[in-house]
Design a protein with these regions (language model features):
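Short, solvent-exposed loop/turn segments at secondary-structure junctions
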Residues: 31, 61-63, 94-95, 147-148, ...
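C-terminal extensions of enzymes
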Residues: 1-18, 24-33, 40-41, 144-150, ...
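Hydrophobic alpha-helical packing residues
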Residues: 22, 163-170, 210, 239, ...
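Glycine-rich phosphate/ribose-binding loops and adjacent secondary-structure elements
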Residues: 164, 173, 177-179, 185, ...
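Non-catalytic, usually N-terminal nucleic-acid engagement modules in DNA/RNA processing proteins
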Residues: 1-184, 297-300
Length: 379
């Protein structure tokens, strides 16, 4: 892996990352395909058409449904889903702690019940790395605990210490797996995760600890889980400066276009969030003038595209009125078109961000973008 910062504009940075599955230009928004597909009937051909650089899939869900061992028999997730660009897999940790019925956290890992059939499953650092190795993703995430944002300082500190020990085990297991002859991707990369709730001291200490581990990248987890936007931005302000400047920084699970604009200004490279697809399936679409709800009656006779000048498949061919009709009729095409538009909007915004940073005009771009999106609601 080679990561090179091309341009800095204040704390915002535009970088180029070379991986075994292709080049990633940052800042980048990863399109979330939990089980190897974007919800809303979006194919990998669609993703290529709308400019997606990185797809993100979920280790936990792929493990409990189809099974990572089966996917390995197909040559890994890339071949299984016919995607030739980078894939990031999360560790499964967040789902273990938030979706499944937690039985017990031990030093070895976590035992829990599957949310599908109730069977007992054990997952620890080694198991998470083994599953992600079977999937053969470009980037694997370390197994961590995401403590509740309002947990006590002592609980957060104990959790972070355990996450650090788990990270060391993840690194050792990945090194072992990448040396095996039958490993799907022997150049799989490992990102560690910074935790610490909204406690400055713990965040900083943990960032300083994991930056010494010489990982391929560093994520900031445990945000967008109930804290205010101001708290999120503050944690980025105090944490990012303590992570290596020559490695990518990933803000997990974030977020809205406004969140992304603010986080880029604080040195973040990678983003992911389900908002574009989830909102699209419910008729909410993003524009440069704010978010629209196409279910609203005001669009019943609206012959305009979702956004004038947008190059997405929905805006090239269909009116707001027609898409509203599809949504009201519960036709899958309506959800698909809204999802494609939203993902295209995000991908295009990231391209504009990269260009603005490279031309050292990010402050002006951000101000202009925010002025449009934070104006009066458009319905």
């Amino acid at each position: 892996m080679k990561y090179e910062v091309l341009t800095k504009d204040g704390r915002a940075k535009s970088a180029r990352m070379e991986t075994v599955h292709g080049i990633i230009e940052t800042p980048v928004f990863m399109n979330v395909g939990t089980v190897g597909a974007i919800k809303g009937a979006v194919s990998t051909d669609d993703l290529r058409e709308i400019g997606t650089q990185v797809e993100l899939s979920n280790t936990y869900h792929l493990h409990v449904r189809t099974g990572d061992r089966l996917i390995k028999q197909f040559g890994g997730l890339h071949k299984f889903m016919n995607w030739d660009r980078p894939i990031l897999t999360d560790s499964g940790g967040f789902q273990v702690f938030s979706l499944a019925k937690l039985r017990r956290i031990r030093e070895e890992g976590v035992q829990f019940n599957s949310h599908i059939d109730g069977r007992k499953i054990f997952m620890g650092p080694e198991e998470s790395m083994q599953i992600q190795s079977n999937l053969g993703s470009t980037i694997a995430m370390a197994f961590d605990e995401c403590p509740p944002s309002r947990a006590s300082d002592q609980y957060i500190r104990d959790s972070v210490d355990r996450t650090t020990r788990w990270l060391l085990r993840c690194k050792e297991e990945m090194a072992r797996l990448n040396a095996l002859p039958d490993t799907v991707n022997r150049e799989q990369l490992l990102f560690g995760i910074n935790q610490g709730g909204v406690v400055d001291e713990i965040r900083i200490e943990h960032a300083r600890t994991i930056r010494e581990m010489n990982l391929d990248g560093y994520a900031i987890g445990g945000l967008a889980v109930g804290e205010s936007h101001e708290e999120m931005y503050h944690i980025l302000d105090v944490t990012v400066p303590h992570l290596p400047e020559d490695k990518p920084v990933y803000l997990m699970g974030v977020g809205t276009p406004v969140n992304i604009l603010e986080a880029v200004d604080r040195g973040v490279d990678f983003f992911d969030c389900v908002y574009p697809s989830r909102n699209g399936r419910h008729g909410y679409v993003y524009t440069n003038q704010g978010k629209l709800n196409l279910f609203n009656q005001q669009y019943e006779l609206d012959s305009r595209p979702i956004e004038e000048g947008c190059g997405c498949p929905a805006c090239r061919s269909y009116s707001r009125a027609y898409i509203r009709h599809l949504l009201k009729a519960k036709e899958m095409l309506g959800m698909r078109l809204c999802t494609l538009h939203n993902l295209y909007f995000y991908n295009t915004m990231m391209k504009e961000i990269r260009e603005a940073i490279r031309e050292r005009r990010y402050a002006g771009y951000k101000a202009s973008k925010l002025a449009g999106m934070e104006g009066p609601p458009k319905g």
